[in-house]
């Protein structure tokens, strides 16, 4: 659904907007609960904003990295896809150390500190060269993609891998 809009407005605008949403949402998490009449609404609005940004970042980074002129694309893409795991571990580690040093009542400051990551990436994506994603200027259309049987096999594999990832995540945290 969003692919046609991203192609129309460009990957740079899309990824910078996604980073802005993530930074604003995380910063809002520290500020909005005190500004709004209901702290819960402040938290919900913030979570929705940074979730939209984070989801877009996840979807947009793969094609941007894929378009980069690297010699070893497979290794680079594998590294990119491992960042979710490294990010989870890093966030847990940094949060734990932060809470041990500053206490749980300082959680708002942690949200502001975490917002620095997308804030720095706003500059990074605004200034870095982004290669065109398709050679001839026209990609595969959605209808054309739906007609390929391999597409549906990949969809099923992604559903199964997502289900197994969630199962492992739930099992490991239990």
Show which residues each predicted segment covers.
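Helical-face signature of the major facilitator-like transporter fold
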Residues: 40-51, 157-158, 162
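Extracytoplasmic gate region of multi-pass secondary transporters
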Residues: 147-174
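Cytoplasmic helix-loop-helix junction between adjacent transmembrane helices
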Residues: 44-82
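Helix-to-loop junctions at the C-terminal end of transmembrane segments
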Residues: 1-11
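C-terminal ends and interior cores of transmembrane alpha-helices
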Residues: 20-37
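Juxtamembrane intracellular "pre-TM" segments in multi-pass secondary transporters
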Residues: 132-154
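Helix-loop-helix hairpin linking two adjacent transmembrane segments in secondary transporters
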Residues: 71-72, 76-130
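Primarily marks hydrophobic transmembrane alpha-helices of the MFS/SLC 12-helix fold
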Residues: 12-15, 43
């Amino acid at each position: 659904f969003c692919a046609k809009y991203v192609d129309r407005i460009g990957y740079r605008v899309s990824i910078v907007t996604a980073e802005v949403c993530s930074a604003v949402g995380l910063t809002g998490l520290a500020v909005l609960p005190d500004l709004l009449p209901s702290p819960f609404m402040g938290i919900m609005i913030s979570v929705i904003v940074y979730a939209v940004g984070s989801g877009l970042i996840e979807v947009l980074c793969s094609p941007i990295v894929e378009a980069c002129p690297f010699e070893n694309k497979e290794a680079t893409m594998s590294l990119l896809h491992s960042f979710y795991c490294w990010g989870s571990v890093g966030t847990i580690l940094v949060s734990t150390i932060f809470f041990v040093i500053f206490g749980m009542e300082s959680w708002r400051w942690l949200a502001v500190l975490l917002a620095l990551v997308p804030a720095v990436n706003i500059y990074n994506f605004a200034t870095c060269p982004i290669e065109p994603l398709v050679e001839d200027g026209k990609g595969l259309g959605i209808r054309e993609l739906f007609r390929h049987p391999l597409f549906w096999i990949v969809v099923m594999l992604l559903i199964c891998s997502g289900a197994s990832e969630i199962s492992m995540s739930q099992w490991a945290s239990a």
